Swiss-Prot record:
This is Argininosuccinate synthase. Pathway: Amino-acid biosynthesis; L-arginine biosynthesis; L-arginine from L-ornithine and carbamoyl phosphate: step 2/3. Keywords: Amino-acid biosynthesis, Arginine biosynthesis, ATP-binding, Cytoplasm, Ligase, Nucleotide-binding. GO terms for cellular component: cytoplasm. It is found in: Cytoplasm. The gene is argG. It comes from Pseudomonas syringae pv. tomato (strain ATCC BAA-871 / DC3000). SUPFAM superfamilies: Adenine nucleotide alpha hydrolases-like, Argininosuccinate synthetase, C-terminal domain. PANTHER family: ARGININOSUCCINATE SYNTHASE (PTHR11587:SF2). GO terms for molecular function: argininosuccinate synthase activity; ATP binding. Belongs to the argininosuccinate synthase family. Type 1 subfamily. GO terms for biological process: argininosuccinate metabolic process; L-arginine biosynthetic process; urea cycle.
Amino acid sequence: MADVNKVVLAYSGGLDTSVILKWLQDTYNCEVVTFTADLGQGEEVEPARAKAQAMGVKEIYIDDLREEFVRDFVFPMFRANTVYEGEYLLGTSIARPLIAKRLIEIANETGADAISHGATGKGNDQVRFELGAYALKPGVKVIAPWREWDLLSREKLMDYAEKHNIPIERHGKKKSPYSMDANLLHISYEGGVLEDTWTEHEEDMWRWTKSPEDAPNVATYLELTYRNGDIVALDGVDMTPATVLATLNRIGGENGIGRLDIVENRYVGMKSRGCYETPGGTIMLRAHRAIESITLDREVAHLKDELMVKYASLIYTGYWWSPERLMLQQMIDASQVHVNGVVRLKLYKGNVIVTGRKSDDSLFDANIATFEDDAGAYDQADAAGFIKLNALRMRIAANKGRKLF
């Protein structure tokens, strides 16, 4: 790579990125700017400042991005009822474009000519970070140490850290056997026993949710108020986007909601098993579909479902900043103008049950849909012509002797 003068590093303060920090300083003889994001991962971010200072970093960014994350990334994604491969709520995927955006903003502010991240060469995150970076700053240099160095085991990283006096904790609390990623939307677990697809996940792995068997024996009722497709209040109390999600995480976790054990297809080609806890997101998805069920036109709803598969794939594979994702987002957002109202849910032992939905913009007409006398609101005789017209092409084919089986 051409000469690098200053690098902005996505820095957590953990072993991997602390080693990367020193490795960048030594390998490229460059100045390193650290960026640590608070996305609601539930860990203290300030210790990263002390570690960076101890390693000679002069420019340190620690940003609370929780509101921006939920408002500008999570909520827009949930307007589309987004699910990857039928199950995954994209908790890791949706955080990466925001981190990439902030890396580029800091690079512009500090005059850095490169960015760096700690994603490995096997995963999706390297693609997500770098596609976002190139979309926002085409000429930026990207340094991905895991694709360059030979420190390919935790033990080698530990040895490197000790050799270079990098402040780490070799002894202390027991390290989790899983590779984990967390933000306000979810926490994920990979590796360890999960690499055997037949081995059941361990109960003590889960951090956010109670086991459904241990959840309360009494159901929790909850009302979610929607405006233009986004939740603006819980049980009538107005809340910011981040507060909404944090509250739903807490309530959902207490009721054993949001656990998932899946094998997904990574963009780089391999299959990967992961376990996820997404309590708030699971509640949001069910509630959003419920409010849309009474406020969206049928064909708009069906078209949204068709587009969602592509939209989910774009987010999963790192194309959040692509023109096609932006185009789809405009269509999705336009569909949400009338998605207003209240959804009532019952949460019970891992289940999210819709018990009511209402809206001033509802397209549900009880006078037409009733099983009782509709007083002439709907003429059932009209159905005969409707059915004959829709059967016409099949009748023609049958008259021609076309066989169906």
